Amino acid sequence: MDKVLLGALEAGGTKMVCATGYADGTVVESQSFPTTTPEETTATCAAWFKDKGIAALGIGAFGPTAVNPTSPRYGQILETPKTAWRYFDLLGNLQGPLGVPCGYDTDVNVACLGEVTFGCAQGLTDVVYLTIGTGVGAGVLSGGKLVHGMMHPEAGHIPLVPDPRDPIANDGACPYHKNCLEGLVAGPAIAKRWNGKKGSEMADDPEAMDLLAGYLGQALAVYILCYAPQRIIIGGGVGDHTPIVPLSRAKTAEVLNNYIVTPEVADLDTYIVNNSLDGKQGVMGCLELARQALEA
């Protein structure tokens, strides 16, 4: 299996990352394409993979998307703000031209899978992977399996208590929920609050980082209470390029208020951590998803 060439596709709202590699997580080749129309984008990606001779493909898609194989909409993008992509059959438009087994899940679930298989969550059975960038999404591993249920978790949209210091309190950037985590900490919220600036441009502003870390701490406390993970891993542009992760530890502890007493939560420095695979966790998770599809 280690010598069988596999395909990986991170399907994002702004770009598609196509890659080939092996079951041990080694990435052989990768190339990014802009996300344009559904038809053009999938045709470009399928053509790129067609020449590589892959045996299977793992797809991690932006969401919401239908990840339950028994659903009649399995493989489709669902109620996304990207209107042209709503109810587009992403899986079918890739698997059809390629004719190889395909694994399909969300982008954050495959990132979680990457960390569990190759990164800082190896050996763990219960993990939350959170990405904070243009949006906020969470991948959840419970009992050694990625959580799906009726669909995948949408934990980036949990409602939060607005901070009275916040100029966009009750008017966050999420078009669906004004005071959800995504609406208050993702890139568009940062830009709305601070005159178009990026998270990295606000990284040295203590008050700004304290505000964002407070929101993240609220959310992480909820994830701990609901999912009881053995580790929480955070990635994405805002997560990687600001001090929000270390600052959120004290905020999380404040919300929990000593209610959870476990060895893991006692050491938040090793419990709430940044991603460990240098941004490759999504692609590497897709390779693992492809391996699973080939062996199914």
Segments and roles (model prediction):
Residues 136-138:
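Active-site histidine-anchored catalytic micro-motif
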Residues 1-57, 65-73, 92-102, 114-126, ...:
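ATP-binding/phosphotransfer module of carbohydrate and carboxylate kinases, centering on a glycine-rich
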Residues 71-87:
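A charged helix-plus-loop insertion that forms the helical arch/lid used to bind
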Residues 103, 109:
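Glycine/small-residue-rich loop that forms an oxyanion/phosphate-binding "nest" at active or ligand-binding sites
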Residues 30-32, 80, 149:
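Residue-level detector of high-confidence beta-strand sites
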Residues 147-164:
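A conserved active-site-flanking secondary-structure segment within enzyme catalytic domains
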Residues 107, 133, 286:
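Active-site glycine-centered loops adjacent to acidic/histidine catalytic or metal-binding residues
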